[in-house]
Curated annotation (Swiss-Prot):
Subunit structure: Part of the nuclear pore complex (NPC). The NPC has an eight-fold symmetrical structure comprising a central transport channel and two rings, the cytoplasmic and nuclear rings, to which eight filaments are attached. The cytoplasmic filaments have loose ends, while the nuclear filaments are joined in a distal ring, forming a nuclear basket. NPCs are highly dynamic in configuration and composition, and can be devided in 3 subcomplexes, the NUP62 subcomplex, the NUP107-160 subcomplex and the NUP93 subcomplex, containing approximately 30 different nucleoporin proteins.
Organism (species): Arabidopsis thaliana
SMART domains: RanBD (SM00160)
Biased composition regions of type Polar residues, renumbered to the chain: 1-10, 431-440
Modified residues (N-acetylglycine): 2
Location of the region described as 4 X 2 AA repeats of F-G in the Swiss-Prot/TrEMBL record: 245-274
Protein name per the record: Nuclear pore complex protein NUP50A
Modified residues (Phosphothreonine): 430
Amino acid sequence: MGDSENVQQPSKKRGALKQLSRDNPGLDDDDDSAELESGTFKKASDEVLASRRIVRVKRKEPSAAPVAASNPFAGIQLVPTTAPASTPVGTNAPLAESKLAPAEAVVEDNQKASDIEEGDEVDSKKVDVKDAVGEETEKTKDKDDNHCGKSADVQVAATEVAQMVSCDTNVCNNAVEGTDQTDFPLEKDSGGDQAEKKEKEGNGIEEADKNGDNGAFSSFQQHSSNKNAFTGLASTEASGSSFSFGLVSQDGSTGTGSLFGFGLPSSNSSSIFGATGSSIIKKSEGSGFPPKQEVSTETGEENEKVAFSADSIMFEYLDGGWKERGKGELKVNVSSNDGKARLVMRAKGNYRLILNASLYPEMKLANMDKKGITFACVNSVSEGKEGLSTFALKFKDPTIVEEFRVAIDKHKDSKPMEKAAEKSALPLKTPENSPTATDT
C-alpha cells in the first residue's frame, strides 16, 4: 500500500496563464485598460464646438424606375440620307456639371489634448465618408461622359463608312459601264451623256425581261455578249473555250450540253488544247471501250458423263503419315467416246486440279474409320512421281462411302470391251470384200 501512495501522478503540460486574442494581443494591456476605464471623457467647450464645422453627407436615393440603356447603334444608317447631318462631326456632348459641393476642410484649434483627440476622431470619419462619396460620383460622371462620347464617335464613323460605300459603288458602276465601251480611264461625263447611259440601261433591262432572264443574271450578262454567267468581264465570242457553268441561249432556254464542262465556241477558232470543237466531239464519239470477248475455258470434261459426285477431303500417305492435299468435289467421270473412267477432284474456290487418276481392274478399296476409304492409283497431277501412290478420301456420311465403292467397282473394269466386240462383229476384210481401186 505504501508503494502505491508514493507513486507520483504524471505531470500535466504547463499551460499559459493568459489567453492571447485579437482583442488582447499583448500582456501589458491590463494597465492601459485599467487607466482607460478609470478615466472619463470630457466634452469640448461650447466655444470650441462653435468654431468647428460639422459636415453631414447624404446620398441621393436612386429612382424607382431604372433608366433604359441607350442603344449605341441607334444612329447608324446603312443607306446614306440625302440631307446633310444637322450636327457637326467634331462636336461632342458637353460634360455634366457636378451637383455636389466640394469637400470642405474642418477647422481645428490647438487646445486641450482631450478636446483635440475627440475632435480629430469625429472629423476624420466625416471627411473620409465625404471623400468616398465624391469619388463615386466623379467615377459615375466619367463613365457617362465616356459612354456619350463613344456613342457619338460610333455614329460619326457609321456615317463616314456609309458615304464611302456609296462612293465606291458609284465608282464601280461607272467602271463597269466603261469596260463595255472604251478601255480609257474614267472621265466626268456631261449631263447629256448620263441621260443617254440611263436610257441604254433601261432598254437593256427591258430586253432582258422580254427574253425571260431575271434580274439576278443581268449583272453578270452585261459584261459579255454570249450571256455566259461566270466568264471574265471582257469576254467576247471570238475568245477560246473556257470553263463555264453552261451557256444561256438567246431565247431564254438552256442548251442541251453539260452544265459543268468546257464551253465550246460557236466559231471555228482554236480551243485551249490546240484543236477545234468539232474534232473534240468526233474524238469523244469514237473513243469507246471495245466489248469484252468471252473466252471459252475447256476443262477436258466436256465429252464425259458424271457417274458419281460428292464433297470430300483428300489425304496422301507420305513419309509414314497422312498429309492433307485439299478439299473439293470428287467425281467419277466416264468418257462417252471410249468408255474409260477416271477420278477427278478439284479444290473448292479456285477449282485447282488435285486428283486425276484412271481406274484399272486391279484397283482395291479399303474402308477407313467408317467415313473414309483408301486406294492406290497413279496421280498424273503430282509431278516427278512415278508409280502408285496411296490416297485416302473422307466423306461426310458412311452411305456416301458405299456409293463411291459401288461406282468404282462398276467402272474399274470398263475397258472398251463392248466396242471391241462390235469391231469383232464387223465382217473381216478379205480380198473379196476389200475395196478395189475403182472404189477409191
